[in-house]
Amino acid sequence: MATSSHQGAAAGSQMEHRLCETSIGQGERPRASRGQESNFKQSQGTSTLRLLLLGKQGAGKSATGNTILGKAVFESRFSHHMVTKRCQSESVSVRGKQVIVIDTPDLFSSLGCPEVQQQNLRQCLDLLADPYVLLLVTPIGHSTEEDKKTIEGIQGVFGPQAYRHMIVVFTREDELGEDTLQNHIESKKYLKKLIENIGSQRCCAFNNKADKKQQELQVSQFLDAIEFLMMESPGTYFEPLKTENSGVQGCGTGVTYKGDNLCGSKKRQPQITGPGWDRDTPELRVLLMGKRGVGKSAAGNSILGKQVFKTQFSEKQRVTEAFASHSRLWNQKKFLIIDSPEISSWKLDESDVKEHTFPGPHAFLLVTPLGSSLKSGDSVFSIIKRIFGEKFIKFTIILFTRKEDFEGQDLDTFTKENDALCNLIQIFEGRYAVFNYRATVEEEQSQVGKLLSQIESVVQHHNNKPCVIREKELLNIILLGRSGVGKSATGNTILGRPAFVSQLRAQPVTSRSQSGRRTLDWQDIVVVDTPSLNQMSGTEKNPAQLKKEIKQCLLQNCEEGMKVFVLVFQLGRFTQEDEAVVEQLEASFEENIMKYMIVLFTRKEDLGDGDLYDFTNNTKNKVLKRIFKKCKGRVCAFNNKETGEDQETQVKALLTIANDLKRSYDEHSTSWMDQLKSAVGQITTVFK
C-alpha cells in the first residue's frame, strides 16, 4: 500500500525529534551550531540552494517538502497510486538563502514505466544547478526492495560522489514509539551501511503531521544537517552530471535507453548517448521578447515553420495577451519557442514570466524592427534586467525584423552608419539575426536555420545551463535623523520585533550603530539604527568626520546588496536640529545625496483623519518643501504603535518605495552609483 503523506500517529502528539547522536563506525563528529550559520548562508558564495527530494512512491517526499517550505505546496495524500507524477519545485527564503525544494515522483522503481521515468529524470536534472543537496526520503517501518533500488538508482545517476552530498530524511518519526532512530538504523543492514557511508550527522527524522512548532524544530535541525554537510564538503559541491557520452547512466529502472530504442537489460543502466534528440531530451527554452507590435509572434511562427501564434495588425491593443509556447525539432534538438506579451506588462506581474520560463530561458530573442528607435537605455532592458539580472545580455540575440523595408540597401553599411543601432549590436557582442518576411520558402528556411544555429551556439557557450531567474536582492535600510524622532521604534516596526531599545528619555537612547535582520515577502532586510548625527563625536564641525562615521556604520552593519538611506522626522515637529541634520548630510555627501533618500515621518497617528499627501503638499515649512522636492516625493509615515497587519502594511509601503527607488535609477542612469561610491570613500556603493 502506497501513501504520500501517511505518518501514523495523531498530529497533536509531541514527539522528540531524534538525530543520530553517535556515528556508526566513524567516531564522534561535531554538530553544526548556530554560530556556524554562515556555512548555510554563504554556501560557497551563492545565494541559492536546491534540495532534491528522492525516494520511493509513498515515502513522504511531498509531505517532507511541504514541511521544509512551511506551507502546503505539493499534493500529499493517502493513495494506492502514485500521487506525484512529475517534477515540481517551490522556493522559500531560509536563514538568508533562497532554498528551492524540488519534489519528484518515484524515479527508480522497477514497477514504473521506463519511458516515463526517463522523462521525469531528465526534467529533474534540468531543474538542477550547483549547489544542491540530495535528500533521500525513506519511511520508518517495514522496508521493501524499492527502498534499496532507490539507493542503487541514486548511485547510478549521480555516481560515486552521491554519498558525499546526501542527507537521509526518515519520515513517520512517530512510528518509532519508544525506540530510537539509531536502533532502527542498526536493525537494517542496508541502512546501517548507508549511514556509515554518509555519516550520522547527516540524517534526521520528520513527523510531517506534527504541529507547527514541532515542524519548525524539525526543519531547524534539518538545516543543521545541511550546515554540517557544507562544512564537510567545501568548494564545488558536485561533479558534472553528464558522462563522457553526454548520457545519464545507471538509473536502476531495469531497462537500457539508447536513442529511441528500448532494449531489455538486466544491468539496470539506462543510457541516453550522443548529441541526438530523443523524447526525453530537455527542451531548450527560447524566450521571444520586445515591445508591442514588433513582430514577436510572427517571428515565432517563422521559427516554428507553422502558424501557431496569433498575429494581426492592431494599433490600439496588444494582440498577444498571455504567454504561449510551442516546440519544434532542429538538428536533432528540441526548441521550445515562448511567445510573450508586450514587455512593459512584465513589470506588473513577474509570476507569468517565471512560470513559463522556469528555471530560466536558455536564450532570449530581443525582437525589434530594423529601423526602430530601440536604444541601450530603453526601459525594455531594465525590465529584463530586473527579472534575470545583468547576465541576460550574454544569453541574448537581437532579431531584427522587416528587412524587406530596406530592400536594396546594404545591411552592414546601414548598421555601421546608424550609431544607435551599432551601439545596440555592440552591447550584445555582435549577436544578431535579420528576418525578411517577403522571403521565399527556401530563403525563410535559410534565415531560420542561421538563427537556430546562433541559439545553439549560445546554449553551448553556457554549457546548456539556462539564464536563471534573479533572486530578490537583500535590502539594507539605514535610518538617519536626530535623537528622539523614533528611529529605533521605526527599526523595530520594520523588523517586526523589539530589536532596538526604544524609550522616551531626555538624553539620547541610541549611542552606537546597530542592526537587525528579517525576511518579508521573500526579501531579506537588514535595518541599521544609528545614533543622532550630531551626537557622533566630532561631526558637528567636521563634515569629513561625519562621512567617516557613516562609512564605518555601513562597513560594520550592512550586508552585500542594495542600501537605502531613510531620513526620519517626527510629524508636526520639524526642528532646527532636524534642519541641521539635513545640512550636515548635504555638506558631507554633496547636495544631491537627497535624491537617493526616503523621508519617513513617525507619529502617523497624529494625522488623525488627515492625509499624508495633503500634509506634504500644504506644509508652509520651506525647508521641508525643499526636502520633499529633492527626494522627489518619496515620503511615507509610520505609526510605530501599530501591530499585526496594519504594521506590515506600513512596512510594505516603505519597501515598495525603496525597491522603486533602485528600479527608477536602474532604468535611467548608473552614474549616481559612482557618485555615491565616491561619497562614502569608495568603500561601498549604496546600491550594489
Swiss-Prot record:
Region of interest: G4 = 171-174
Name the Pfam families on file.
AIG1
| Chain residue ranges for the region called G5 | 207-209
Listed CDD domains: AIG1
List the InterPro entries hit by this protein, alphabetically. Answer: G_AIG1 (IPR006703), GIMA/IAN/Toc (IPR045058), P-loop_NTPase (IPR027417)
List every stretch annotated G2.
82-86
Record's Gene3D superfamilies?
P-loop containing nucleotide triphosphate hydrolases (3.40.50.300)
Task: Provide the GO MF annotations for this entry.
Answer: GTP binding
In which tissues or organs does this protein occur?
Spleen, thymus and T-cells. Greatly reduced in T-cells from lymphopenic rats.
PANTHER family given in the database record: GTPASE IMAP FAMILY MEMBER 8, GTPASE, IMAP FAMILY MEMBER-RELATED
Full protein name:
GTPase IMAP family member 8
Q: Which organism is it from?
A: Rattus norvegicus (Rat)
